[in-house]
Curated annotation (Swiss-Prot):
GO terms for biological process: apoptotic process; response to glucocorticoid; RNA splicing. Interacts with RBM40. Component of the U11/U12 snRNPs that are part of the U12-type spliceosome. InterPro entries: Apoptosis_promoter, PDCD7. The gene is PDCD7. Residues 49-71 have a biased composition (Low complexity). Promotes apoptosis when overexpressed. Residues 12-48, 82-96, 109-130 have a biased composition (Pro residues). GO terms for cellular component: nucleoplasm; U12-type spliceosomal complex. It holds the Pfam family PDCD7. Residues 232-335, 362-411 form a coiled coil. Keywords: Apoptosis, Coiled coil, Nucleus, Repeat. This is Programmed cell death protein 7.
């Protein structure tokens, strides 16, 4: 059974276009109609939920022949209404590309042609205003137009890539050409010598000449580009560029090496500073430990004296307690009516005085012994401090002498490298004569005193306290003549 025509005479037309469905949660709203976003095509309503599927016809081979009446719109069985299939609908609005993407990827409207009778071709819409596109999209569009105006239109996919012109001979090519020419010259030189020797033998001479001719032709071919000024100039420019690049690389390598050496020197200086700090900390700890040991030794030596002093104090307390006890017993006996004789009191008092004198002598002896021990320990501690101070001063003096020797070696050269008979020895003796002769010192000071000026003089300065070191070399030529340490 044939299907009835889609639109008959009494059948209503397609429904009006419905507004697009609301965007899902979190998606931007669909854009308004514009050249970049044409309105969606109307679709045939179907039983499918949501957007309906487009109306598709069966293939032409499966369609029955339609009569003229049916073609003119009449109804009847076994005929189709000759309606062309509508184009495929565009993707959903939320999946459309942004209006700032590449023009090659931007969807274009369908080509002009007969559309469905119920869907006339949409009119050309004007460009969307700024408030429709948004500030970000409008700025993006302006940036793209500016880039195209400055740098030209970007090359589309499939466009032929312009071929780069030959930039000139490479150094490898020139080197290979020169090496081949040098080999040919060597062979021709050998053949020339052989030709001179084979002048008497005509056949051998002809054979050698036949070998020489192609070599000469090849040599002329090899040397022909070298006669062109442009070829030679380009080769020289490339060679100069390579030379400058190598110089830059060497300079950078030299700078990196100097940086590494400076970093190594800084690391050595830091290590030396750390070592000095550690030595100082160790010395402080050792000094404190030594003081504690001396104090412990002094306490050990003085412990016996202090013990004896404690015994004398205890004996004094015992005598005081005995005197108090006798007084209490005497009072108790007096209450009972018993009175001791006066001789007993005298004897008791005599013994107490004798014991107090003995304890006093012992106490004075122990105090003198303690003072002697303290003086002895303080003397030992003072000697130890003097030895430490002398050792420190000796180290400082050695350090100063080493620095002085280093400065003198920079000024006058290393004495190990320059013996006494060297040409610079008189100058060394002249500049160091004040260290060995008092008249020379007085004369030098007198010469310096001639330049004394008041302290408020604008050009006055102090006499240098040490050697005036020379400045660094001002150029490379002078640096080659100076040995830097």
């Amino acid at each position: 059974m044939a299907l009835p025509p889609f639109f008959g005479q009494g059948r209503p037309g397609p429904p009006p276009p419905q507004p697009p469905p609301p965007a899902p949660f979190g998606c931007p709203p669909p854009p308004l109609p514009s050249p970049a976003f044409p309105p969606p095509l109307p679709q045939r309503p179907g039983p499918f939920p949501g957007a309906s599927a487009p109306f598709l016809q069966p293939p032409l081979a499966l369609q029955p022949r339609a009569s003229a009446e049916a073609s003119r719109g009449g109804g009847g069985a076994g005929a189709f209404y000759p309606v062309p299939p509508p184009p495929l609908p565009p993707p959903p609005p939320q999946c459309r590309p942004f209006p700032g993407t590449d023009a090659g990827e931007r969807p274009r409207p369908p080509p002009p042609g007969p559309g469905p009778p119920w869907s006339p071709r949409w009119p050309e819409a004007p460009p969307p205003p700024a408030d429709v596109l948004g500030d970000a999209a409008l700025q993006r569009l302006r940036d793209r137009q500016w880039l195209e105006a400055v740098f030209g239109t970007p090359r589309r996919a499939g466009c032929p890539v312009p071929q780069r012109t030959h930039a000139g001979p490479s150094l490898g090519e020139v080197r290979a050409r020169l090496l081949r020419a040098l080999r040919l010259v060597r062979r021709l030189r050998g053949l020339s010598q052989a030709l001179r020797e084979a002048e008497a033998d005509g056949a051998a001479w002809v054979l050698l000449y036949s070998q020489t001719a192609p070599l000469r032709a090849e040599l002329a071919e090899r040397l022909q580009p070298l006669t062109q000024a442009a070829y030679v100039g380009e080769a020289r420019r490339r060679l100069e560029r390579v030379r400058r690049r190598r110089l830059r690389l060497r300079e950078r390598a030299r700078e990196r090496e100097a940086e590494r050496e400076a970093e190594a020197a800084r690391a050595v200086e830091r290590e030396q500073e750390i070592d000095r700090w550690r030595v100082k900390c160790v010395q402080e700890v050792e000094e404190k430990k030594r003081e504690q040991e001396l104090k412990a030794a002094a306490d050990g030596v003085l412990s016996e004296v202090r013990k004896k002093q404690a015994d004398t104090k205890r004996m004094v307390d015992i005598l005081r307690a005995l005197e108090k006890l006798r007084k209490l017993r005497k009072e108790a006996a007096a209450r009972k009516g018993v009175c001791p004789p006066a001789s007993a009191d005298e004897t008791f008092t005599h013994h107490l005085q004798r014991l107090r004198k003995l304890i006093k002598k012992r106490s004075e002896l122990y105090e003198a012994e303690e003072r002697a021990l303290r003086v002895m320990l303080e003397g030992e501690q003072e000697e130890e401090r003097k030895r430490e101070l002398e050792k420190k001063q000796r180290k400082e003096k050695e350090k100063i002498l080493l620095q002085k020797r280093e400065i003198e070696s920079k000024l006058f050269g290393d004495p190990d490298e320059f013996p006494l008979a060297h040409l610079l020895e008189p100058f060394r003796q002249y500049y160091l004569q004040a260290e060995h002769s008092l008249p020379a010192l007085i004369q030098i000071r007198h010469d310096w005193d001639q330049y004394l000026v008041p302290s408020d003089h604008p050009k006055g300065n102090f006499v240098p306290q040490g050697w005036v070191l020379p400045p660094l070399p001002s150029n490379d030529i002078w640096a080659t003549a100076v040995k830097l340490h």
